[in-house]
Amino acid sequence: MKIYLTNQNLKFSKHLEYFKNQSVMKYEKSKLDEKISSQDIDFEFSKINFDFFYNYQIFPENIIESYCQWNHENRNMQIGDTIVQQVFLPPHKTLSQKVIFAVRINKIIDEPKRKGFSYETIEGHVEKGVSIFTIEKNTQKTVFKIHTFSKPGNLLTCLAGPIFSLPYQSFCTKKALNNVKEIVEQQQRFSKG
């Protein structure tokens, strides 16, 4: 974890090179806290353009700005790719602390009724564990899910967790759920055109 007063987006490639050489945080999944959050999406699953999703455009840009290894290398997402995350605390691009950490793709999901990916946190992240992001076709609806297994990644987040980290994580999750719903439903409005 690195903390800055200035936006680091012009230095993302430098941060990417650093984090590509860092290890995934060790964890035992059975000892992590599990949470599943979901959002129904009013759009036919088969008509969704998943490009935004596989480019990690999940969180609103005032919360997390990211830099993905596969975009840096002009290709599609692969297992082992690193994502640099710049978190804005509070969620405002200008008037905030900029916290930099990273995650690594450990699974890509490409099933007929389920698309998504998962990543694990890299050393220095505020959490340790794994997050799974999927858009799924259930019996009658399309659902976006965020499924996490995590614990605080360092002493600071362990101490601040109940007061700050957990409420902020819930806030970010709600914003991500709404953001993906909005992006997909905009596709529907655009396709009706």
Where do the PLM segments sit?
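Hydrophobic-ligand binding "helix-grip"
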Residues: T94-N138
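A generic structural signal for short coil/turn motifs at secondary-structure boundaries
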Residues: H92-T94, L156
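Beta-strand/loop substructures that line and gate deep hydrophobic ligand-binding cavities in soluble
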Residues: T121-P167
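General beta-strand recognition
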Residues: V84, G116-S118, V143-K145
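A conserved amphipathic terminal alpha-helix motif
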Residues: G153-G193
